[in-house]
């Protein structure tokens, strides 16, 4: 790791956030351009469609993921949970999935051995839909996103297909990146933890031209990390420069790039014996030491924002992503009758992907007969090419055995006998329209629809099979808001979703036919309230999400999938976010979700969905006093997750409920910030998620993290 260590030392490493020098005022049509300095950007100003600047504290008064405009949340008939930059900093998150623990209604799912963009469940519905500035990140097999260049995380609840296209009805995640700033600064930080993390970061920004029309932002993160898991370590390097050019007062061009190098040890966690946990220490590694997987992921965004006049605005954007993954792992497939000897297979992966996306959005504001409109018209085109070479041994003929209680590693590697070599091309064209309608001071409506034209060509070269499919789908959405008083809004919405089932399936590939697409329906009723002058947002919602033709792991054919029929999730959620006082900030929520199979030829009707707890909740609170103690901050977090199904086969295997407590303290002085975080302060033993009895991911034992940030 010599190059990585050198990068860490030279970087000085930052963990802190860039603090806005002024509060941000948002309007329906536009958002602040970070580089504009004090004041606000009006509808005639220089905002970017689909982006939003820094917000102070834990504020969530506006979010762009629901409508791609910065309409205040209380006026939008959709629920969006937000984790601003201060949340990421307060919990010392290095990856965005750590923040999910404090976003209500988001449950962890399969993390693919730590390799890729994790899957998660929103409102009980599993998804891997994650976006960055509105562009899809879950194409190919990129590494989990680093938190260093993230300004805020938004979780859209309910169907988002009316804007984003093929997706899942429970919701999606959209990451908003840090943007160029006129304020000149450079921030160095360093972060270490009790499991061997050494992390360095840089965050810098300012003007590149004397007249301030060319601005930049540069983020770097370099780290080497250990783990509470034996033989599991990782290295990661992120380089993320952004440059914006204000060509004219009405036109701005932004170029944003990101380069990621990632090395990890593929880790499927621990196993259960007779569907019971706790027989093995959570540190026990059941793979093969020394086997690493390497990932390269490079992306480019180019955005052109143009203002025609005070009411009309155009955004043209392109996104390119290319990456590759290569490595080996050993994974458990069976256990012998002695309940201690497991059979493993050897897995060799070589993946490559190329993604190109083009987007065009036109936003206009106008009145018709006294009714106000904010109209969004858009189109996008996506092309994804991927090659997946996945080779493995046969655990039945070459068991690659391991004693789980007294493991002896370093056996001769078994021969590769089961090849899989896939080529896949996906193209998708979307046309969409949305209207935010102001019917009166009390009543607002949201209507929208998207048309998707989807094409897929899938080739399995090893067995010379082929699947081609074309689909056309319309995804409508509608909602209504009633504000009887300025501080309260009652709302309802309904929307649909569409997702083609792609990739290999045992039956479908041999027949040469495609699986039917997943379809979804979601609807909710709720209330939002802004308290304390709008600094605290409360949301209550009752929801129901239905999904058909769900693709789930096939228990009879490892590595393949089947369409499970229909599932349903219904429940309610309560959230509170923002500032209770200038000294106290809060992010809290509780979710009740009853998520079950409603129709299936394999799984029992009524079986709970994997990794979805019926009860879950979290609370993160930070207090920073004024006066003589100004600069000190103390806080804590509580994460509670109920019992949930541990596999998708309806076997009765259950992950136990848990409550984990975190604590934090920091001190800001002059241009520095020092902090101490303690994750799982009471060292609670728990399990985050599982895929089946052979793939169970234990939660972290007590972890101490120290960080220092210096800003110039």
Role assignments for model-derived ranges:
Residues 300-323, 345-459:
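Face-selective signature of the C-terminal outer-membrane beta-barrel domain
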Residues 32-183, 525:
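Acidic, small-polar-rich N-terminal luminal/periplasmic segments of exported/outer-membrane proteins
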Residues 148-151, 162-241, 247-251, 298, ...:
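Outer-membrane beta-barrel translocator/receptor signature
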Residues 223-227, 239-307, 320-353, 396-428, ...:
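Acidic/polar loop-and-plug regions of large Gram-negative outer-membrane beta-barrel proteins
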Residues 639-647, 666-712:
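C-terminal beta-signal and adjacent terminal beta-strands/loops
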Residues 244-248, 258, 353, 371-376, ...:
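Structural signature of Gram-negative outer-membrane beta-barrels, strongest in the C-terminal barrel
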Residues 544-546, 563-648, 685, 707-711:
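Gram-negative outer-membrane beta-barrel transporters
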Residues 305-319, 323-329, 491, 517-579, ...:
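Membrane-embedded beta-barrel scaffold of Gram-negative outer-membrane proteins
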């Amino acid at each position: 790791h010599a190059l990585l260590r050198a990068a860490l030392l030279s970087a000085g490493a930052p963990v802190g956030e860039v603090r806005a020098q002024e509060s941000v005022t948002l309007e329906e049509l536009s958002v602040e351009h970070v580089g504009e300095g004090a004041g606000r950007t009006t509808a005639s100003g220089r905002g970017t469609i689909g982006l939003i600047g820094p917000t102070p504290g834990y504020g969530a008064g506006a979010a762009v993921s629901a409508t791609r405009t910065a309409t205040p949340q209380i006026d939008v008939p959709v629920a969006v949970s937000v984790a601003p930059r201060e949340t990421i900093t307060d919990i010392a998150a290095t990856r965005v999935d750590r923040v999910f623990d404090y976003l209500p209604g988001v449950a962890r799912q399969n993390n693919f051995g730590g390799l890729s963009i994790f899957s998660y469940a929103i409102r009980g519905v599993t998804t891997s839909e994650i976006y960055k500035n509105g562009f899809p990140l879950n194409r190919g097999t990129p590494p989990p996103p680093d938190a260093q260049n993230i300004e805020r995380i938004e979780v859209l609840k309910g169907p988002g297909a009316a804007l984003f296209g093929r997706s899942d009805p429970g919701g999606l995640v959209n990451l908003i990146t840090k943007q160029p700033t006129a304020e000149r600064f450079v921030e160095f930080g360093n972060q270490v933890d009790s499991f061997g993390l050494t992390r360095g970061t840089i965050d810098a920004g300012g003007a590149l031209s004397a007249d301030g029309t060319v601005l930049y932002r540069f983020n770097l993160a370099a780290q080497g990390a250990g783990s509470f898991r034996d033989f599991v370590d990782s290295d990661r390097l992120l380089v993320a420069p952004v440059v914006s050019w204000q060509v004219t007062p009405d036109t701005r061009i932004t170029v944003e790039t990101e380069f990621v190098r990632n090395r990890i040890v593929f880790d499927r966690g621990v196993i259960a014996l007779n569907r019971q946990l706790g027989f093995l220490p959570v540190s026990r590694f059941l793979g093969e030491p020394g086997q690493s997987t390497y990932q390269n992921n490079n992306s480019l965004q180019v955005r052109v924002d143009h203002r025609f006049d005070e009411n009309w605005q155009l955004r043209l954007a392109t996104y390119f992503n290319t990456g590759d993954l290569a490595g080996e792992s050993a994974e458990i497939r069976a256990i012998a009758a002695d309940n201690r000897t497991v059979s493993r297979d050897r897995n060799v992966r070589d993946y490559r992907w190329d993604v190109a996306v083009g987007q065009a959005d036109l936003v206009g504001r106008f009145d018709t007969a006294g009714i106000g409109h904010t109209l969004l018209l858009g189109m996008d085109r996506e092309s994804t090419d991927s090659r997946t070479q996945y080779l493995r041994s046969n655990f039945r003929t070459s068991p690659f055995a391991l004693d789980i209680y007294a493991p002896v590693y370093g056996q001769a590697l078994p021969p590769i006998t089961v090849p899989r070599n896939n080529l896949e091309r996906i193209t998708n064209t979307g046309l969409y329209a949305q209207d935010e309608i102001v019917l009166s001071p009390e009543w607002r409506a949201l209507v929208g629809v998207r048309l998707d034209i989807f094409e897929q060509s899938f080739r399995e070269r090893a067995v010379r099979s082929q699947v081609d499919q074309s689909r056309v789908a319309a995804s409508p959405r509608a909602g209504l808001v009633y504000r009887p008083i300025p501080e309260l809004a009652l709302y309802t919405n309904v929307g649909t979703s569409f997702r083609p089932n792609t990739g290999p399936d045992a039956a479908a590939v041999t027949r040469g036919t495609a699986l039917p697409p997943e379809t979804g329906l979601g609807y909710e009723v709720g209330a939002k309230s802004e308290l304390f002058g709008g600094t605290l947002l409360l949301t209550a919602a009752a929801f129901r999400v239905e999904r058909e033709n769900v693709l789930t792991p096939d228990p009879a054919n490892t590595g393949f999938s089947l369409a499970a029929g229909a599932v349903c999730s219904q429940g309610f959620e309560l959230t509170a976010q923002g500032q209770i006082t200038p000294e106290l900030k809060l992010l809290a929520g509780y979710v009740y979700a009853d998520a079950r199979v409603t129709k299936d030829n394999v799984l029992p009707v009524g079986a709970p969905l994997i990794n979805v707890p019926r009860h879950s909740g979290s609370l993160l609170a930070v207090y920073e006093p004024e006066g003589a103690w100004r600069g000190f901050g103390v806080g804590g977090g509580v994460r509670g997750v109920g019992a949930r199904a541990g596999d998708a086969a309806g076997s009765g295997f259950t992950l136990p409920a848990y409550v984990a407590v975190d604590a934090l303290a920091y001190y800001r002085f002059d241009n520095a910030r020092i902090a101490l975080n303690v994750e799982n302060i009471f060292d609670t033993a728990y399990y985050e998620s599982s895929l089946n009895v052979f793939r169970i991911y234990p939660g972290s034992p007590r972890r101490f993290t120290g960080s220092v940030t210096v800003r110039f």
